[in-house]
C-alpha cells in the first residue's frame, strides 16, 4: 500500500486529503456504475436464460398457429374452388336455358311436297293446300330434291331441310298411267276418278293397272305401291298340291273337267282349226262333301304340270288358281262386293296376259250369285250378278282364263250365269256308290299302315289282301239295305213314302271321317297297352258311330230345301221321319216334328 502512495508522491503529488477523497469518490462512483452494469448484465443474462428456456414452447405455439392458419387457408381455397365451379355451372345452365328459350321461341316449321325446280335456284312446293315458289337454303342441294319428296320449310316458307317420302295417306286403285309417264289416272274409294302425279319411287319402279297406290290427296301425289292385301285375303294364287290320283270315285267327273279345261289350253291350234271355242266356265254341283273343291284344285295342278311338260320346261310352266272365298266377298257397304269382283278378274287378266293359264274358282257360288229377286231382306244380288256376268263376258277376249264354280244348290244360282256362253259345262258330282266308296276307302286305307296282327294272319300275312278285305267288308256294311241301316222315311207331296238308307247320304268326306275314327281307335288301343295296328273291327265300329252321330242332322223345318242340298231331287218332300235304331237294335225309331227346330244340313 505504501508503494503506490510513494509513487504518487514522487510524481509531484502533495498527498493532500482532498485529492484522495476525490479519487475515492471517483472510484466509488465508477464502482457503483460497474456494479450497476453488472447487475443489469446479470438481469439481462437471467432474462435471456428465461427466454432461452421458454423459446421451444413458443416455437411450438407458433407452429401450431401456422398449421391452423394453413388449414383455414386450405378450407378457404376449397370453398373458393367450389364457388367457382358453382358459378361456372350456373353460367352453363343460364346459357342452356337461354338456348332452350330461344329454341322454344322460334316460329314453327312447316312441311311441303317438292314439285319442281328452276334455274334461278327457286323451287315449287305444295304446302297447306297452296302451290308456292320459294327459295332454298344454301345447305340444301337442289339437285338432290326428287319429285314428291317431303321438305321442311322455315317461317319464311323457304326450304331448309329435305325429308323422306310420305308414308301415310289414302289408298286408290291405278287405272292407267297417262302419256308422259309422270301422271296416272286412279280410282278412289267411291270409284271417283282423279289424276295424280307419280313420285320418284313410282317413276323408278314398274306399276300396272290394278295396283293399289298410296296418295296424299291434298298434294295430289302418289308415293308408293301397296300390296293388294284385300285381294290376297280372297284368293290363293299358288296351285294346290293335289293330284287326280288323290281323288277316288270320280273318274267320269275328272274326265269331263279335264276335257273342258285342259284340252283348250294344251291344244289351242286344234281348237282354232276346228273353229271350236273353249268353254268360259264350268259348274261343279252336287251334295256337300263329295269332292267338288278337290276336283277344281286337282285340275289346276294337272294343268300346271302339263303346260310345263309341253313347253319342255321352258319358262315358268306355271298356272294360277284364284280361289275365291265366296261369302267373304259380301260387304255391307254398297258397291264394295262389286269392286272386289272387278279386282279378282283384273288379277286374272294380269296373269293371263303373261301367257299363263288362270283358273278362277268360286266356292259356294250360290251364296253370292243367287237368282235376282230372290233375296228376303236385300236385293244385293241385283248388282252382284250383273257384275259377274260382265266380267265373264269380258273373259271372251282372253285365251287363258276359265271360271269354275262349285255349289250344292245350283237351283239358287241366277240362270243368266248358267246359260251357255258363260258357265258352259255343268258337271254333277254325285254321292259315291259302292264301287266309288271302295275307291275312296283305298285312298285312306293302304297296305303301308300298321295292321292288326290277327287280321293280317287271317290272310296269311298278305297286306294287300288284308286291306282289300277290310274295305270290302266295311263297304258292304255301309251299303246294305238292312234294318239297322235305315235312316229316314220321307213323305212326298203326293202322299207317297220312301225309306232312305245311310248309303243314300254317304260322301267322300264321311268316308274320310270313318277311316280317321278307326285310326284313332287303333292309336288309343296301342297307348293303353293293346296290340298295334288298324283292324276291321275298328272300321265297322267307326262306321256305326258315324251313322249314329248324323241321325239328328236332317233339317226338319224345311224338308224340301234340306233334300235339295242333300242331293235328293224330284217330288217335293213335306215330311221327314227318322228311322235310326240304337246300336243294340233295342231303341225304337222316333219321329221328328216338322216344327221342332231348324236343324242342320247333313
Swiss-Prot record:
Q: What is known of its domains?
A: Consists of three main regions, an N-terminal coiled-coil domain that binds to protein Pup and functions as a docking station, an interdomain involved in ARC hexamerization, and a C-terminal ATPase domain of the AAA type.
Gene Ontology, cellular component aspect: proteasome complex
The organism's taxonomy opens as: Bacteria, Bacillati, Actinomycetota, Actinomycetes, Frankiales
Task: State the species of origin.
Answer: Frankia casuarinae (strain DSM 45818 / CECT 9043 / HFP020203 / CcI3)
Residues passing through the membrane, by range: none
Q: So what does this one do?
A: ATPase which is responsible for recognizing, binding, unfolding and translocation of pupylated proteins into the bacterial 20S proteasome core particle. May be essential for opening the gate of the 20S proteasome via an interaction with its C-terminus, thereby allowing substrate entry and access to the site of proteolysis. Thus, the C-termini of the proteasomal ATPase may function like a 'key in a lock' to induce gate opening and therefore regulate proteolysis.
Name of the molecule in the record? Proteasome-associated ATPase
Q: Where is this region: Docks into pockets in the proteasome alpha-ring?
A: 601-602
Q: Which PANTHER family match?
A: AAA-FAMILY ATPASE, PROTEASOME-ASSOCIATED ATPASE
| Subunit record text | Homohexamer. Assembles into a hexameric ring structure that caps the 20S proteasome core. Strongly interacts with the prokaryotic ubiquitin-like protein Pup through a hydrophobic interface; the interacting region of ARC lies in its N-terminal coiled-coil domain. There is one Pup binding site per ARC hexamer ring. Upon ATP-binding, the C-terminus of ARC interacts with the alpha-rings of the proteasome core, possibly by binding to the intersubunit pockets.
Q: In which pathway does it act?
A: Protein degradation; proteasomal Pup-dependent pathway
GO biological process, any = modification-dependent protein catabolic process
Amino acid at each position: 500500500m505504501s508503494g503506490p502512495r510513494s509513487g504518487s508522491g514522487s510524481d509531484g503529488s502533495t498527498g493532500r486529503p482532498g485529492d484522495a477523497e476525490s479519487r475515492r469518490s471517483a472510484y466509488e462512483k465508477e464502482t457503483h456504475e460497474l456494479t450497476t452494469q453488472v447487475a443489469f448484465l446479470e438481469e439481462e443474462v437471467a432474462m435471456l436464460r428465461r427466454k432461452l428456456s421458454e423459446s421451444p414452447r413458443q416455437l411450438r405455439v407458433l407452429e401450431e398457429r401456422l398449421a391452423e392458419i394453413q388449414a383455414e387457408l386450405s378450407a378457404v381455397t376449397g370453398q373458393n374452388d367450389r364457388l367457382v365451379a358453382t358459378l361456372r355451372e350456373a353460367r352453363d345452365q343460364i346459357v342452356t336455358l337461354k338456348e332452350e328459350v330461344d329454341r322454344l321461341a322460334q316460329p314453327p316449321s312447316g312441311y311441303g311436297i317438292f314439285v319442281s325446280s328452276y334455274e334461278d335456284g327457286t323451287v315449287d312446293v305444295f304446302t297447306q293446300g297452296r302451290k308456292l315458289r320459294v327459295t332454298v337454303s344454301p345447305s340444301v342441294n337442289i339437285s338432290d330434291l326428287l319429285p314428291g319428296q317431303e321438305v321442311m320449310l322455315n317461317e319464311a316458307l323457304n326450304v331448309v331441310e329435305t325429308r323422306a317420302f310420305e308414308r301415310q295417306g289414302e289408298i286408290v286403285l291405278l287405272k292407267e298411267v297417262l302419256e308422259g309417264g309422270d301422271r296416272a289416272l286412279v280410282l278412289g274409294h267411291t270409284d271417283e276418278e282423279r289424276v295424280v302425279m307419280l313420285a320418284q319411287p313410282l317413276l323408278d319402279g314398274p306399276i300396272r293397272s290394278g295396283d293399289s297406290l298410296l296418295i296424299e290427296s291434298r298434294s295430289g301425289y302418289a308415293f308408293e305401291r301397296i300390296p293388294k292385301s284385300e285381294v290376297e285375303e280372297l284368293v290363293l294364287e299358288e296351285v294346290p298340291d293335289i293330284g287326280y290320283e288323290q281323288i277316288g270315285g270320280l273318274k267320269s267327273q275328272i274326265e269331263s273337267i279335264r276335257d273342258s279345261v285342259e284340252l283348250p289350253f294344251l291344244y289351242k291350234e286344234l281348237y282354232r282349226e276346228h273353229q271350236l271355242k273353249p268353254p268360259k266356265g264350268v259348274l261343279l254341283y252336287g251334295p256337300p262333301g263329295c269332292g267338288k273343291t278337290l276336283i277344281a284344285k286337282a285340275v289346276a295342278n294337272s294343268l300346271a304340270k302339263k303346260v310345263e311338260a309341253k313347253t319342255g320346261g321352258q319358262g315358268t310352266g306355271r298356272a294360277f288358281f284364284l280361289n275365291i272365298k265366296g261369302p267373304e266377298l259380301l260387304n255391307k257397304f254398297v258397291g264394295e262386293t262389286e269392286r272386289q269382283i272387278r279386282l279378282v278378274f283384273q288379277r286374272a287378266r294380269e296373269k293371263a296376259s303373261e301367257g299363263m293359264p288362270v283358273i278362277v274358282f268360286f266356292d259356294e257360288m250360290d251364296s253370292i250369285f243367287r237368282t235376282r229377286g230372290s233375296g228376303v231382306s236385300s236385293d244385293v244380288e241385283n248388282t252382284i250378278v250383273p257384275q259377274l256376268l260382265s266380267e265373264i263376258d269380258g273373259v271372251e277376249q282372253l285365251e287363258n282364263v276359265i271360271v269354275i264354280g262349285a255349289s250344292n244348290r245350283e237351283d239358287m244360282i241366277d240362270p243368266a250365269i248358267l246359260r251357255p256362253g258363260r258357265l258352259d259345262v255343268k258337271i254333277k258330282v254325285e254321292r259315291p256308290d259302292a264301287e266309288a266308296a271302295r275307291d275312296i276307302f283305298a285312298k285312306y286305307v293302304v297296305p303301308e299302315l300298321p295292321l292288326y296282327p290277327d287280321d293280317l294272319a287271317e290272310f296269311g300275312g298278305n297286306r294287300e289282301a288284308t286291306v282289300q278285305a277290310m274295305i270290302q267288308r266295311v263297304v258292304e256294311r255301309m251299303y246294305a239295305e238292312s234294318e239297322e241301316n235305315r235312316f229316314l222315311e220321307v213323305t212326298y207331296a203326293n202322299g207317297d213314302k220312301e225309306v232312305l238308307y245311310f248309303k243314300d247320304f254317304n260322301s267322300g268326306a264321311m268316308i274320310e271321317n270313318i277311316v280317321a275314327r278307326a285310326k284313332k281307335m287303333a292309336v288309343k288301343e296301342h297307348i293303353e297297352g293293346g296290340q298295334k295296328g288298324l283292324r276291321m273291327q275298328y272300321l265297322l265300329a267307326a262306321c256305326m258311330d258315324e251313322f249314329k252321330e248324323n241321325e239328328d242332322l236332317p233339317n226338319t223345318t224345311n224338308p224340301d230345301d234340306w233334300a235339295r242340298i242333300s242331293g235328293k231331287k224330284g217330288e217335293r218332300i213335306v215330311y221327314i221321319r227318322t228311322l235310326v235304331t240304337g246300336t243294340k237294335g233295342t231303341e225304337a225309331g222316333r219321329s221328328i216334328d216338322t216344327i221342332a227346330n231348324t236343324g242342320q244340313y247333313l
